[in-house]
Amino acid sequence: MQPKRMSHNLTVGEKAGSPFNVILNAANNTNSDNSSNNSDNENDDNQNNNNNNNNNNNNNNEEEEEEDDDDDDDSQQNRHNISIPFTINKNSINNNNNLINNINNNINNMNNNMNNNNNNNNMNNNINNNGNSNISNNNTPKVEKKKTKGKWTSEEDQILIKAVNLHNQKNWKKIAEHFPDRTDVQCHHRYQKVLHPNLVKGAWTKDEDDKVIELVKTYGPKKWSDIALHLKGRMGKQCRERWHNHLNPNIKKEAWSDEEDQIIRDQHAIHGNKWAEIAKFLPGRTDNAIKNHWNSSMKRVSNNNVHLKSHAIEHSLSSQDNQDSPKSIITSSSPIPTTTTTTTTTSTTLITPPPPPLLPPPPSINKKEKKIKQPKKRNASEIEQTLSQPHINQHESSPIVFENISNGNNKIDIPAAQYLMTNGISCINNNNNNNNNNNNNNNNNNNNNNNNNNNNNNNNNINNNNNINNNNNNNNNINNNNNNNNNNNNNNNNNNHSNVSANTNNNNNTINNNVSLQPPSQLNSNIAQLPSTPKNLAHVNIANKLNSPGELMANIVTPIKFFQTATVSMNSSSKNYNNENTNNNNNNNNNHHHHHHNNNNNNNKRPRLDFSSATPTKNNESFSADLCSQFPDILFSPIQNKNNKESFLDNSGLSPLRSPLHTNFFETPMKNYEYLDFNSPKIPNTISPLKNFNSPFNKINNHSNYNNNNNNNNNNNNNNNNNNNNNNNNNNNNNNNNNNNNHNPNHNSHNHNNHNNNHNHNHNEFAQPQPPQGNYQQSPYKNNSTTASSTLSTPSYSNNSSISSSSCSSSSSNSASKATKVIQLSSSGIDKNSLLTINAKLNNNHHKNYLDSSSSSSSSSSSSSSSSSSSSSSSSSSSSAASSSSTPNNQSDLATVPFTPDDNVFNNNNNNNPPTPGKTKFKSRFSPNSKPYSYPQEYDNYGQSSSTPQNINNTYNSICLGTNNNNNSNSSASNSFENNEENNNENDNNGSSSGGDKVPQMDSSFMALKLLKDNPNKSLFSKARKILGLGNISSSSLSPSSFVQQISNSASASSTPTSSSSTPLSSPTTTTSSVAAAIINKISSTPKYFSNQNQNQNNNNNNNNNNISNNSNLSAFSTPGGNDHVPNFESNSFLAQSPFQDILNSQKLDQLHQLTQTNQLSKSKVLLRNHKNSNQTESNSRSTIESINSNGSNNGNNSGSSNSGSNSDKNNGKPISFRLMESSKPIEGL
């Protein structure tokens, strides 16, 4: 008998709890719900397919949507009641307990799978041990998802456009309310990708392709939204698809090979429609190309193969199951009498069971995958294995009883039903896995997006830091501009020299951009060798022998944070940049006046600073990440270096290093607590962390650059040449004193001086106390026994007659020692700032003398240029006298050796010492002092009061300048002072031919005399020996007799013009008489006193003592301005309290002392001129001074008195600065 085909709505009996009814309903509900869920997911997946897999030809968008709509229609058909054909053998259905148990197990599995799938159909199947099956089907109302359509109609498009305009393209949920069967995502995608008015569809043009390639090179192949902003009408998705599918140069465009086809088949059987996963196995092929190749070529072949295989299996199964089928009559008995079971059939057709299809590929988690329409097919062996599984035994109390119709055959043969149940459950399981995997993928995608966002945030933070640094840089540039503008305004007060001042300021503008930007090369090398953790710093210190130039030690307060410095974009390095400045200055010096304005224009160019690499980041190779992890907000931290006093990063206690990029610092960022730094400013430096000891109160010149070794030689040569020209011009001025027509020579002199000033600023600002790139010479410490031969280079002498031997000595000292900012000893004299420091200590007026230092800087060049006219006639005799000197290395000067004085040398048990470094508002742990710096009132009024450097300059010019024109005004005198000040700076810098930095010098004998003014009771020679021993002076000058012999030798040389300095004196008695005669002969009888002028002239003369000839030990008393400017010595201020009293009394010079007590000294000024002859003899010195005195007394009366009387009452009673030069020549016969 043929088997009957039955539909799914066949009810087996009238009982609601019939097992078959439950099974079929469960299967029906399960499949319908599953299909609906799959259809919903499929619809979204299809929409995503439309979004993610657009072809580059956008004309195919609507066609793809139509294809997806067809798939949706097929899925909607699956929502209807599905006919489930199965066959029942009538003979084997009775007494089949295993079948019922198997069905119950399948129901439990279905329940578990349904619960895992989070469906709202709660099926609580409670199977009792007694065999009673209480099955309750609690179908809760399901929240139906909004139905979606496939294809958009033109009416819907019009409604969507109006809704979008109504809601301003923002609230897509409100827009979706206008469509009962559309979601907000569908509305958004439809408008953005199809209906947007700015959307460009169609093929890509050549220009668009080129633009995409260019933008990908700029932004990279990820920032498609940024790339789309540059392509009007194109979206980021379009640009991405265009690049990855067509424009990427790595794409393969060859024909598909058989190997690639086989890889696609194998991977498709594993991954399904995960084209991106399959593309990983095919380099050079995109996922879109693989999908198109699969759908166009390989899918048909695969379908044909599947059809042939399914037909063969169907034939084999039909041959096995082609037996007599039972009738569709099922009888059931029940112990309950009121219950009867009947069998109703809707259709009874005799058919063969359908063959099980082939197994489909494994389920896919990709949303792009389409629903598999064919049910899963199983072969006969799988069905037999499933049916042979153990089942729950039928209980005796079970209400369902089957008759044994099959004559003892307990096996029921319903392969279709078994296939339905097992296949249905497996499909549900697969669907559950698909959904979960999809969710997991979405979460992974979200996590990836979050990671990308975090990375973007990190990048933004780094960029913000760079912007902050750049902003700081801009602010500093503004500050520098303000300073330069202020200086321009001040210099505009000079009449005919505004261009000269402009050139100077322009040079400063160029240098300001290089301030504190390039550390020395040795420091960079040491920084690169430092480890990242502080515990290894000791090893580095041992390796560097604790005295290397760039040695760094960990700070107590904050860790070391290494940073890269900014680079100047105008040139490859700051060294080249400095060389360019030097070349420009050389050219301008050759042209002098004609290219004066061109120099101004060239120096105005500001190099663009690139701070992209200056900002430290934790990913920077020179940035210590583990040290800086605890201090993320600190960019630059203080760095301590207590063992190396020349370090670029000096001792810093609590305040960070000052730089143009940062302003969060305290008063004094650079602390050097072991040195008595008298030149430490009392106010914060506004520009750089390094102090310019040459001019502490010059705001512009307080700069630093560390790479300018090559500029020194060039600048020195230029200065030497310009000195010759300037001296000639000054000689012309001396010859034409009363003529106002001398304007053109003066103007030419101004031009020369201006160029010299440019070089001078470059030298001063670049030659700061920083180690240069060349050979580094570390300054000795207190305990170092360093000799001049081991530490100093041989000074080079010039054959030019206008350059003094003292400038050569200055070159040797400059090349030998670095600027430790302490007082240095020199046989040629005391440095101007060192002299002012000593005077400030003795006079308790430290800041006032600092203000006078700027005016004092001009005396050297003017005196040297004025004296050159008188010294030219005696140059022949000077060479013979210089050759007779017996100094070491046959030189006229002793080498200068830097030293660190003891504290008790300067501290005489008083509290009026100048402040030492280390004092800040907040006491530094390195500072021995407790009081902070005091802010002087004079600095706020700098350049305004009557004691300003300008008035002092006017006074000085009227007195000491060789061009004493009676009709010149104060402004012209100030202009001439400005030029002479520049020349003086040139003379200071002429000696630095060895490439070293300028170091302050100090005359040890003068220091001994000055420091003993306050202590007249102490022994002069013991104190002098202590001070002179610090300068490595020869032992012959330490004895009392030699000390007296030096004084007598100088005095005798001044009193007897015809005598030679090499002639020894017979005895101290004759020396005493010669000293008395020399001094008394130079004393006149005009006891006029002008205290302010006297003090200012005194400072200027002391400043000019750097370049005094060493052959003349004590110059004559003279006054360059005439007899109207003769201060007297008061007994309480000079000899009565000076160490000279001990000397004079010991040599029985009572007459000189008596004249001093009775105010009979007529001339108090010690005029020490800079002689421009390296071999000038003492007789030449005397003739020079006498000629200057004669010229000054005849021609400078009015100009001197016109500027000195305004401040004549301010400095009465102040001690007069006195200068005593020691002789470098050993005295014979003592």
Curated annotation (Swiss-Prot):
A GO molecular function held by the record: RNA polymerase II cis-regulatory region sequence-specific DNA binding
Name the UniProt record assigns to this protein: Myb-like protein A
Gene3D superfamilies: Homeodomain-like
Biased composition annotated in UniProt, kind: Polar residues: 316-326, 382-397, 515-529, 612-623, 773-782, 942-954, 1173-1188
Keywords: DNA-binding, Nucleus, Repeat, Transcription, Transcription regulation
Organism domain of life: Eukaryota
Origin organism lineage: Eukaryota, Amoebozoa, Evosea, Eumycetozoa, Dictyostelia
Biased composition regions of type Acidic residues, renumbered to the chain: 61-75
Cellular component, GO annotation: nucleus
SMART domains assigned to the protein according to its UniProt record, in alphabetical order: SANT (SM00717)
InterPro entries in the cross-refs: Homeodomain-like_sf, Myb-like_DNA-bd, Myb_dom, SANT/Myb, SANT_dom
Bias (Basic residues): 368-378, 749-761
Main location: nucleus
HTH myb-type domain boundaries: 144-195, 196-251, 252-302
Regions recorded as binding DNA: 172-195, 224-247, 275-298
BP GO terms, sorted: mitotic cell cycle; negative regulation of transcription by RNA polymerase II; positive regulation of transcription by RNA polymerase II
Function statement: May control cellular differentiation.
Region (Disordered) location: 22-79, 115-151, 315-397, 432-529, 573-624, 694-814, 849-954, 967-1001, 1051-1070, 1088-1131, 1163-1230
Compositionally biased intervals (Pro residues): 352-364
Biased composition regions of type Low complexity, renumbered to the chain: 28-60, 115-141, 328-351, 432-514, 576-590, 701-748, 783-814, 853-886, 898-913, 967-978, 1091-1113, 1189-1208
